[in-house]
Amino acid sequence: MSTQTRYPEATIEADREVPIIRITRDFRGTPAQLMKAHTDPELFVRWVGPDSISSRIVEWDVRNGGSWRYVSSRGDDEFAFRGCFHTVSDDTIVQTFTWEGMPDQVALETLHFEDLGDGTTRLHAQSLCDSFEARDGWLSSGMEVGVNEGYAKLDGLLGEL
């Protein structure tokens, strides 16, 4: 699969020992720009998810202990997601992530923005799922399409910041 990005698609890996998904991708932008794109609700909805959906923010309280919820739509179908921000710092976000279609499956996500020193930032994302079955369900869902199409949109957005 190919997208129009300056960088290769995201690397998506599953850990064999623990139910973790790791995603790594480089972006042309600073850690501060990537943090802003992940925490500013008006920017976030412009890039999150595949091209075939649109998203709206329902709740967005970016602070340690704050919560968030957004709804993505495709035609008449809606998909709601929610979580809590546990840590928000200059280069790291730790949050929970739940798709409301399976509310008992909660993942703990860590996003870290590594400054590579040449105007490039490497995103390290890790999702610790509550079971191997949940993790494998994510991986078999076609999530890579949403990840890569969303990150391609994020590439374009970073050029505006």
Provide a role label for each language-model segment:
Residues 20, 94, 98-148:
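Beta-strand/loop substructures that line and gate deep hydrophobic ligand-binding cavities in soluble
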Residues 31-32, 63, 86-91, 113-122:
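A short, structured loop/turn motif at beta-sheet edges
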Residues 24-25, 57-60, 81-86, 97, ...:
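Hydrophobic/aromatic beta-strand elements that line small-molecule binding cavities or substrate pockets
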Residues 22-23, 42-80:
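Short beta-edge strand/loop motif at the mouth of beta-sheet-based domains
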Residues 1-53:
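Hydrophobic ligand-binding cavity/cleft-lining segments
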Residues 57, 158-161:
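Short, highly charged C-terminal tails/helix-capping segments
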Residues 34, 44, 68, 85, ...:
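Hydrophobic pocket/interface hotspot
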Residues 18-24, 31, 55, 67, ...:
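Intrinsic-disorder/low-complexity, polar/charged segments enriched in Ser/Thr/Lys/Arg/Asp/Glu/Gln
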